[in-house]
């Protein structure tokens, strides 16, 4: 079975492809880094009752086909979440820069200290 892939497409027509690297550690676990309760919530005493079960292993000690798929999808979800978080931060920074430029123009080029 081929590993899953994903493609993110913007309304403007740009796209970003996500592919699984099966031997990379992030694709060999069901415990994602961008899902579940935040570190802040866990430090406040929250118990993670929804933590995913570990992958099931076959008689040879290898993950079953469905467990491999779960692990690959967990890593893919982490990749997508990280990418979208970075995109949102870029958009926020771009908007802030535009707002700052507009404010400078409105005040005749001076900035508030």
From Swiss-Prot:
Keywords: Activator, Chromosome, Nucleus, Telomere, Transcription, Transcription regulation, tRNA processing. Component of the EKC/KEOPS complex composed of at least BUD32, CGI121, GON7, KAE1 and PCC1; the whole complex dimerizes. It holds the Pfam family Gon7. Residues 88-113 are annotated as: Disordered. Component of the EKC/KEOPS complex that is required for the formation of a threonylcarbamoyl group on adenosine at position 37 (t(6)A37) in tRNAs that read codons beginning with adenine. The complex is probably involved in the transfer of the threonylcarbamoyl moiety of threonylcarbamoyl-AMP (TC-AMP) to the N6 group of A37. GON7 likely plays a supporting role to the catalytic subunit KAE1 in the complex. The EKC/KEOPS complex also promotes both telomere uncapping and telomere elongation. The complex is required for efficient recruitment of transcriptional coactivators. GO terms for cellular component: chromatin; chromosome, telomeric region; EKC/KEOPS complex; nucleus. One of its GO terms (molecular function) is chromatin DNA binding. The gene is GON7. It is found in: Nucleus; Chromosome, Telomere. Residues 104-113 have a biased composition (Polar residues). Belongs to the GON7 family. Disulfide bonds: none annotated. GO terms for biological process: cell wall mannoprotein biosynthetic process; positive regulation of transcription by RNA polymerase II; telomere maintenance via recombination; tRNA processing. It comes from the Eukaryota. This is EKC/KEOPS complex subunit GON7.
